[in-house]
């Protein structure tokens, strides 16, 4: 009967161990899945870059092709936001697993930190690609306008695209030749493309702000945990010193008690000896 009770008592510990193993397995599976999505995201970034290079080289008179490129960028940003949300959720769950110098807690924090750094690197490269594509597209528009004897600066082009007045610059252009018509369509599509690109770049900037907050939050969590670990070590060391001091004081107290007892015994013997001699001197026959 006692054996059965013992087995039942041990069951919760085994169950907790199994739950911990399952939790760690789920965490690692989630990390692998996010890592796979990051690999796909990196490949998409490169594919978008190649599409932009092709667009700059071949022209953008085909509206459908420009729309396809913009849709690809929108899907990329949406996927990046989804990964960011998953990493934010994973970071919040880390509060349940305090970090230490070794162990699964440390491993969890390091895995999430590496994923955040990977996403940040991909998005940083993507932002550079978008800025470069925007600059090259603006140059294409400026080149077209100069061919039509319309001199404009890059800042004027940027301002005209942003406020929608770019087409006012082209109202006097003669489009009687089909080639000129194609060039104008290319410029018009690029201008529309740049306006969409501006919106996408702002979305990427917002995503970067969210990621910086996530990195900061992750860093603060790590700092708090590191501080707690350091304080715990300091408290443990102080406790050991207190124990050692208590042992030393206890030994000293015991030593002084023994010395005090011996001194009292010696003093008592001296008093008895002196009292015996004193009584022998005043009382005849006293020994």
From Swiss-Prot:
Q: Does the keyword RNA-binding apply?
A: no
**GO molecular function list:** SNAP receptor activity; SNARE binding
Tell me the function of this protein. Answer: Potentially involved in docking of synaptic vesicles at presynaptic active zones.
Keyword field contains Nucleotidyltransferase: no
Transmembrane portions of the chain? 263-283
Instruction: Identify the taxonomic lineage of the organism of origin.
Output: Eukaryota, Metazoa, Ecdysozoa, Nematoda, Chromadorea
Q: Which Gene3D superfamilies match?
A: 1.20.5.110, 1.20.58.70
Q: Which UniProt keywords apply?
A: Coiled coil, Membrane, Neurotransmitter transport, Transmembrane, Transmembrane helix, Transport
Record family assignment? Belongs to the syntaxin family.
Which GO terms fall under biological process for this protein?
cortical granule exocytosis; exocytosis; intracellular protein transport; positive regulation of cytokinesis; regulation of exocytosis; synaptic vesicle docking; vesicle docking; vesicle fusion
Report which gene this protein is encoded by.
Answer: syx-4
Q: Which residues lie on this side of the membrane: Extracellular?
A: 284-287
| One GO term describing the cellular component | cleavage furrow
Origin species, per record, is Caenorhabditis elegans
Q: What is this protein called?
A: Putative syntaxin-4
User: Where would one find coiled-coil regions in this protein?
Assistant: 65-97
Q: Which residues lie on this side of the membrane: Cytoplasmic?
A: 1-262
Which compartments is it annotated to reside in?
Membrane
Instruction: Provide the topology term for how it sits in the membrane.
Output: Single-pass type IV membrane protein
- The segment(s) forming the t-SNARE coiled-coil homology domain are 184-246
